[in-house]
Amino acid sequence: MLQPTLTSWVILAGGQASRMGGKDKGLIALNNKPLIEYVIDRLTPQTSNILINANRNQDDYQQYGPVFGDHFQNFPGPMGGIHAGLLHASTDWVGFVPCDCPRINEDLVERFCRAVTDETDILVAHDGDHQQPVFTLYHKRVLPKLTAFLERGDRKIILLYKECHTQYVDFSDSPDCFVNLNTPEELTQFGQLES
């Protein structure tokens, strides 16, 4: 099994948050606590190597850990954050989670590490029905392929998966792990459920 200490984990907070009215999702409060703090609280017991990908409000994010922006400036979505994470992380294995999922599994890092094989390039969480492409673990050897992928203007992640040795990690027993808050209505509803 890959040791969790040999991985870095990047919280993806670099999006435009258009469905949230352009507000920076990681900094939006849920029950008086920024969403990113929920993610950090879940990740911290699992790994000591947490980084943050943010393209706005970087000074606000720095209180939570090292921050870096995308290298591709045209907002290529989560793929831009994954690319930047692979460039900035000091480990060969780099995991990614979104900033707006307050119920990340307490064994997420371990599950990904257990699934690594010698051939693995990319691991992607699967909830039993769908793949969850922003819950993922990449080996740095994918970086040249990802760079070429983005330079071509590709955005469909499934195409990158086909270029690499991609495997899926079973999270069908914990679909709540992937609850994400994309709109003010979802945030309000979730806050009422959590109170």
UniProtKB/Swiss-Prot annotation:
It is an enzyme of class 2 (transferase). Gene3D superfamilies: Spore Coat Polysaccharide Biosynthesis Protein SpsA, Chain A (3.90.550.10). Its cofactor is Mg(2+). Transfers a GMP moiety from GTP to Mo-molybdopterin (Mo-MPT) cofactor (Moco or molybdenum cofactor) to form Mo-molybdopterin guanine dinucleotide (Mo-MGD) cofactor. GO terms for biological process: bis(molybdopterin guanine dinucleotide)molybdenum biosynthetic process. Its EC number is 2.7.7.77. GO terms for molecular function: GTP binding; metal ion binding; molybdenum cofactor guanylyltransferase activity. The keyword Cell cycle does not apply. GO terms for cellular component: cytoplasm. Mg(2+) binds at D100. GTP binds at L12, A13, G14, K25, N53, D70, D100. It is found in: Cytoplasm. This is Molybdenum cofactor guanylyltransferase. It catalyses: Mo-molybdopterin + GTP + H(+) = Mo-molybdopterin guanine dinucleotide + diphosphate. Belongs to the MobA family. SUPFAM superfamilies: Nucleotide-diphospho-sugar transferases.
